[in-house]
C-alpha cells in the first residue's frame, strides 16, 4: 500500500482493525519502527482530535512530526495547471509536494470540502494533487469526501464494545443551518459495510 487515502486502500480491513487493536493494547511495541523518519502533517483546516491522535501515534512509532498550517503559515498553494501565478498563490502544489517529499517520509493531509462547488470538492483537488506530485505515501486525515482514520477508529470502538456479532448501529445526521462536510458519514457507512455490522 503506497497511500492511505480511502478505506479501500486497506487490502484487508478486518485484519487492519485487529492489528490496530493489538497495537493500541501495546502502543510502544514498534517504538523504533519510525526511527530517523519524519511524518509531514499538512493542515489546510483546523483539527484537534485527529491532529493530536496522529501526532501521538507517530511519536509511539518513533517518528518525528513536522506540522504546517497552510492557512496560517507558508505560502498559499495553487492547484490549477497552466495558471499564471500572479495572484494570491505563491507556490504551486507540484513544487511544494516535491519539496515536502524531500524532507518527509510520509505526508498526512487534512483538507475539508469548500462546500462552494460540489464537483470540485468531489474531485479531491488537494489530496489528489499531493498524491500525484509527491514521491512519498499520502495519508488522509480528512478530505472533502473521506475520513479513513476516523472510520478506522470507529471500527475499533465497535469491535471493542459490541455485545453481538451484528450490533445495531445507527448513523444520525441532523439538520444544520449551514452546509456541513460529509466525509465522516461517508467513511462511517463504508466502514460498517466492511465489518459487516
Question: Residues of each region from the PLM?
Answer:
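Secondary-structure boundary motif
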Residues: 29, 132, 160-164
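Alpha-helical scaffold segments in soluble metabolic enzymes
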Residues: 15, 19, 99, 129, ...
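Glycine-rich phosphate/diphosphate-binding loop of Rossmann-like nucleotide-binding domains
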Residues: 44-66, 159-197
